[in-house]
Design a protein with these regions (language model features):
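Acidic (Asp/Glu)-rich catalytic clusters
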Residues: 8, 40, 58-67, 89-96, ...
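Structural preference for beta-strand elements that scaffold enzyme active sites
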Residues: 13-16, 45, 68-70, 97-101, ...
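Extended substrate/RNA-proximal surfaces in nucleic-acid metabolism proteins
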Residues: 67, 80-192
Length: 295
């Protein structure tokens, strides 16, 4: 599979909807300019994620005619959580498709299940000092089991601004309610790697939300970093159906491969497990474009 030209052709058209870029507090493999130099001619587009800062300014700063890059923002504490003013400013700055991730490292769910704000497996450096989760105030989007008024108002705002919602590291129950609300508003939604151990959304709920119009993310990093068996990933994709699944890399860690290499490895593994090229094309090219509102 090392020189599978069909896979390479698909990845040249693919959009990786989940790539971690630096500079960031978490050590990252590439800055935007380094990413472009590495990936030009190898991948169609990349949505850039950063747990602490919006990535649209990173994109604007570099000259680039090689890869289509899309901005992203994560609603963690460093950006004020569910911050409407920040989103309005970001949309004024960047008129292109933008991914809005709900809280990740500062979600109540993640902080309850992780000793540290930044998971050690993301860094693999004993000298890196992460804050203890117990010392961090979570970004809450629920009160008494219901979405807060501010969250509902925020959802209406990002729908009006034509932004795509990703569920981040919310609990699966929170993700279910949030994504249903945004779908009902007519918005575009992707469930952020619901197979992740700290989310662990039941496949029944994934199918329920896919039927409503949500996309389901399956990331290479869940296999390469979080050690989720490929058999489980395959089972979940087949259960939901390729028409509702998007493959991503979710890499950018210092020790991880480049996004194009990660997607190549992912595709090679999936081909060995019964998938075909048309299905890979659907999950890497067509579905990401629909998610971002490009088609």
């Amino acid at each position: 599979m090392k020189n599978d030209l069909k896979i390479k052709s698909i990845i040249k058209q693919a959009i990786d909807i989940h790539y971690h870029v630096g500079p960031e507090i978490i050590p990252r493999k590439f800055t935007v300019s380094e990413l472009i130099n590495s990936e030009k001619g190898k991948i169609g587009g990349i949505v850039l994620k950063n747990h602490f800062f919006p990535t649209s300014p990173f994109i604007k700063e570099v000259k680039n005619n090689e890869i289509t890059l899309y901005g992203g923002v994560v609603l963690n504490n460093s950006l004020g959580g569910i911050n409407q003013d920040m989103i309005i400013s970001l949309r004024e700055f960047d008129k292109n498709p933008i991914m809005v991730w709900f809280p990740t490292i500062n979600s109540e769910n993640f902080l309850k299940k992780s000793e540290f704000e930044i998971a050690p497996e993301w860094v693999k450096n004993q000298e890196f000092n992460a804050r203890l989760s117990k010392d961090i105030k979570p970004v809450r989007i629920f009160k008494d089991g219901k979405l807060t008024k501010n969250t509902i108002s925020f959802l209406r705002l990002i729908k009006d601004l034509d932004l795509t919602l990703a569920t981040g590291h919310l609990s699966w129950r929170e993700s279910r309610i949030l994504s249903t609300e945004y779908i009902n508003l007519g918005g575009r939604v992707i469930l952020t790697h619901p197979i992740y151990q700290k989310i662990n959304m039941p496949i029944k709920i994934q199918k329920e939300l896919a039927d409503k119009g949500c996309y389901i993310e399956q990331s290479y990093s869940m296999y390469s970093i979080d050690n989720i068996p490929i058999k489980k990933i395959v089972q979940q994709i087949r259960s939901v159906g390729c028409h509702s699944v998007i493959l991503s890399s979710d890499v950018g860690q210092k020790f991880s491969p480049t996004p194009s290499d990660a997607l190549y490895k992912f595709c090679s593994i999936l081909l060995k497990n019964g998938f075909n090229y048309d299905e890979l094309y659907l999950m890497l090219v067509i579905n990401p474009k629909k998610l971002l509102g490009i088609v």
